[in-house]
């Protein structure tokens, strides 16, 4: 399949950890995602958070949508190489990434298929 594939990455941060998670995401993960947009692996990346608390279920508080060029680009694994290039201090980078995931209660990925309404 050669059409773009959208995957939603849901995150639920622990109570009080949202700001720290976002800081670490912007510092360490966003540069890697941005690099992959520049390389053409991704055609779009955006992040969203709920504007309001809603009904209180709080299944997620952050969602990142990544549109991959195609199915083949999902199989490409260039994150580690990009991380080594962008973050020469790998010990600090890995510690901060571990901390970022310690701030989560849950994380899951959902490939979605857009459907025409007419």
Which functions belong to the PLM regions below?
Residues 1, 43-60, 85-118:
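Glycine-rich beta-strand-turn "strand-cap" elements at beta-sheet edges
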Residues 4-12, 63-64:
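Active-site-flanking beta-strand signature of metal-NTP-handling nucleotidyl enzymes
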Residues 58, 64-69:
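Aromatic/basic micro-patches that form nucleic-acid/chromatin recognition or nuclease catalytic surfaces
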């Amino acid at each position: 399949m050669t059409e773009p594939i959208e995957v939603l990455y849901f995150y639920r941060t622990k109570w009080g950890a949202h700001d720290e998670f976002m800081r670490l995401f912007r510092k360490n993960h966003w540069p890697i995602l941005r690099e992959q947009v520049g390389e053409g692996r991704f055609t779009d990346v955006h992040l969203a958070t709920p504007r309001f608390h809603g009904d209180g279920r709080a299944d997620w508080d952050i969602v990142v949508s990544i549109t991959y060029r195609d199915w083949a680009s999902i199989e490409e694994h260039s994150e580690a190489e990009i991380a080594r290039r962008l973050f020469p201090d790998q010990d600090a980078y890995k510690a901060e990434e571990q901390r970022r995931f310690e701030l989560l209660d849950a994380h899951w990925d959902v490939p979605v298929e857009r459907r025409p309404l007419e």
